[in-house]
Amino acid sequence: MRVNNLTPQDLKAYGINDVQDIVYNPSYDTLYQEELNPGLEGYERGVLTNLGAVAVDTGIFTGRSPKDKYIVRDDTTRDTLWWSDKGKGKNDNKPLSQETWQHLKGLVTHQLSGKRLFIVDAFCGANADTRLSVRFITEVAWQAHFVKNMFIRPTDEELVGFKPDFIVMNGAKCTNPQWKEQGLNSENFVAFNLTERIQLIGGTWYGGEMKKGMFSVMNYLLPLKGIASMHCSANVGEKGDVAVFFGLSGTGKTTLSTDPKRRLIGDDEHGWDDDGVFNFEGGCYAKTIKLSKEAEPEIYHAIRRDALLENVTVREDGTVDFDDGSKTENTRVSYPIYHIDNIVKPVSKAGHATKVIFLTADFGVLPPVSRLTANQTQYHFLSGFTAKLAGTERGVTEPTPTFSACFGAAFLTLHPTQYAEVLVKRMQAAGAQAYLVNTGWNGTGKRISIKDTRAIIDAILNGSLDNAETFRLPLFDLAIPTELPGVDTHILDPRNTYASPEQWQEKATALAKLFIENFEKYTDTPAGEALVSAGPKL
């Protein structure tokens, strides 16, 4: 049903001319037929799997390309944005001149002109008061499918008179040959203009650039209104108790929040306002490397017709080899959130969070779980430590220790302390407690099992961890439970997983130094200086 009389003439306002045809808010059936069109070539063409989902290949970009991210520096952003060339903290918000922006915009609009285009109008944000109305324009059917999965799908009534607050023009097939003269990183670009409210994409086919692009925009708009904007998953229990799970890619946000005992609010991006926690998205974007029906049944069963697989190995008979990471470790699937049975309906939002869980994937120093004080909560939120997992960004093939402010520095557009201040206010008002959970490896090099981690999460959510006897871990001064139901007691103290305590001490000292060095960038403010004592002490 075409409920919006969008015509090629309307696209001239964006600089897109002579459009052959517009496929507006296509149905899933239409997208299925378009993606499997035998006349398609290269990365446009999808492959049907035996699970019913279509699989696509995103080319050389199997993750985001943060080094190719730019934001126009103008009167809107000059004094508010967290720029890469100001202050001590490193980030990906590289300034772009108005002149270069116009050049990039010309490249993308030229690429989209004269084509048959897919246009998807959708919402970012489950709260009608603060949601963004976003218009996605692309010439690739599966990219339209991706945003239909990932963003909130408007009703026919909501599409009548839909007025976009933000435009995303995806010109994946075009590149910028003048990048060297313009002082850019490469011929590829992901550029934002917060005055014009437009995102441009060139050279990369990776669907996640559209998803995380809008997250970056929400991260700019909401905290300025006193609303927490969070890189987290969230779910709610039978009694209405809400938990949020912060963490970088691959640390377990999607897996751990998808729990048969609790209803899912969302798996990656949320806001927290006066009414409670709400999802930005209408879908999930789960990692599928080594996915099994036994370990993650809900995610496995979500991979069916209308789901979209990325960069997986599809055998000749249509079966999927989820264990094959030869293309990338960052294999993914996007699916509409209703592919998970146990979700919050009809709107993905709930009350205020009482449990805040920081997920980290560490290499044998941090314990599987610890309970944080108020100051430790701020310290570890600003530190955002994890080992960056292979494949989630271009060029990352080995796990490396990294500090990502607020567990999502790549998507922050304001200074990290602004997110910490808003989160702490929301937590204090709700009486929320924070925990640090290590989903990574122990001293033997063995990854902490999903079974043990799920038992730890259960202990947090049912309150048994708060009542458990604890001991303090040296250097980091973390409160660790002596035992928890369903968890191997031996692993709770990370020192037990080494041949000798001295081996742990050596690795722990090295990690503590990294924490201390990283946190120095926050000590230029009194608030940051006051938090130093909540971190490790040598």
Curated annotation (Swiss-Prot):
Residue positions binding ATP: 212, 231, 247-255, 296, 332, 447-448, 453
Chemical reaction(s) catalysed: oxaloacetate + ATP = phosphoenolpyruvate + ADP + CO2
CDD domains in the record: PEPCK_ATP
Family that this chain belongs to: Belongs to the phosphoenolpyruvate carboxykinase (ATP) family.
Cofactor: Mn(2+)
Protein name, UniProt field: Phosphoenolpyruvate carboxykinase (ATP)
GO terms (BP aspect): gluconeogenesis
Pfam families: PEPCK_ATP
GO cellular component: cytosol
Known partners and oligomeric status: Monomer.
Residues holding Ca(2+): 149, 151
GO MF annotation terms: ATP binding; metal ion binding; phosphoenolpyruvate carboxykinase (ATP) activity
Binding site for Mn(2+): 212, 231, 268
Protein's cellular compartments: Cytoplasm
Cofactor: binding comment: Binds 1 Mn(2+) ion per subunit.
Pathway the protein acts in: Carbohydrate biosynthesis; gluconeogenesis
Keywords (A to Z) from UniProt: ATP-binding, Calcium, Cytoplasm, Decarboxylase, Gluconeogenesis, Lyase, Manganese, Metal-binding, Nucleotide-binding
Keyword field contains ATP-binding: yes
Documented activity regulation: Allosterically activated by calcium.
